[in-house]
Amino acid sequence: MSDMATENLDIDYTKYDFKDSTEMYVHLSKKGLSKETVIEISKMKKEPQWMLDFRLRSFEIFMKKPMPTWGGDLSTIDFQNIYYYAKASDKTEKNWDDVPDNVKKTFDKLGIPEAEKKFLAGVGAQYESEVVYHSLREDLAKQGVLFLDTDQALIDHPEMFKKYFGKIIPPEDNKFAALNSAVWSG
């Protein structure tokens, strides 16, 4: 993006400059990207073998593809200093009041509850690697509307999921599509 495109914008980025302690997670992967990390994520999610195979193939593609050079300088990214899976809660809540307080505080800072009340028919709130809150208007659910996070869709509709997952932007598309396909969550 050119400087001209952003020079007149008055954006306060400090609003989003916060993070939580890693001690609050019910599960946190080791830092670093490896075949073992990819396997750990799949095992934590109790995924079918085909998904583990997809993840591992995507990881191999990621390792072989060069860093893109068409955008900003990404050479300083340390892929071994990243947690690729962090689970903040043991379950997905249907009532916002039941979401853990530390997670609610983060979403309150971002204005998520207000956005749902004002504009959305359904919402899934993802915190780190997992969905912690999921809501769909009852009238839409009765009409057969499916609104699921990807983890639940994989469980509830495995054939549909397998048919469409990773098709629009396949892991072969670019290095970061491959990374996403290897370690996706939520």
Task: State the predicted function of each range.
Residues 2-186:
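Glycine-rich and polybasic anion-binding loops at the starts of cofactor/ligand-binding domains
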